[in-house]
Amino acid sequence: AVIVHFSSYRTMYIASRKHKENIAEYLLYMWQIEDIIRAYNLDIDHIEESVIRPMGLDEERAHALREWYVSLIDMMRCEGVERSGHLQINRNTLGQLVDLHRRLLSSDKYAEYSAQLYKTLPFIVELRAKGGKAPVGELETCFNALYGVLMLRLHGREISKGTADAVAQISKLLAMLAGYYKLDRDDKLEF
């Protein structure tokens, strides 16, 4: 299952590791980094004081992490996502996952993935009905749901049994997709 425990600790290094190991967790993690940057009003000095310094990193790592945040802040400003939305690098990652999702669904070799999607579809339909926003694709709906629940949990809020069931099923689908993504990236997935 896709389970993410968020922390500001060693964010750049965690992001790099997640990108290699679990692309679904990476995407959720990067969405949280975007929100952390917004919470500090895209102010690198405030981020350095409140996020980077408390980590107690050596000077070289602290500098690298600061530069990483600076580059993300610059991208957010250039792309106009200072208040909401996602960086193009994160939208590209989602796009890659959507492309793989479609390829898996169109192949007879990955019936178990299709079966997992069909188990998840009722939750996706329900989430879309509750969403009230412009309709988004199946995977983005899943990621939005997981991210929303993660934020609720971070703030100590309870979630209903129905929501917990939805998140469990969505997590299974995204974990399977993340596994296929890793295989595809390593040229070990055949269509």
Predicted feature residues:
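Short, Lys/Arg-enriched N-terminal segments with co-localized hydrophobic residues
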Residues: 1-11
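A charged, amphipathic interaction segment
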Residues: 87-147
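N-terminal interaction modules that seed assembly of large macromolecular complexes
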Residues: 13-84
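A structural motif
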Residues: 14, 56, 64, 73-77, ...
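Glycine-rich, aromatic-bearing surface loops/beta-hairpins
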Residues: 125-191
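Amphipathic alpha-helical interaction surfaces
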Residues: 36-39, 57, 71-82, 99-107, ...
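Short, charged, amphipathic alpha-helical segments
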Residues: 49-50, 88-91, 164
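Short amphipathic alpha-helical coiled-coil/interface segments
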Residues: 51, 69-72, 94-97, 121, ...
